[in-house]
């Protein structure tokens, strides 16, 4: 459960960074 959660968080963070940039 921790693995998928981390992957999801990473994806959201990446998207957030892309939008912020």
UniProtKB/Swiss-Prot annotation:
UniProt superkingdom: Bacteria
Protein name: Protein YnfR
Induction: By cold shock (at protein level).
């Amino acid at each position: 459960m921790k693995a998928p959660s981390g992957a999801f968080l990473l994806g959201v963070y990446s998207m957030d960074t892309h939008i912020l940039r």
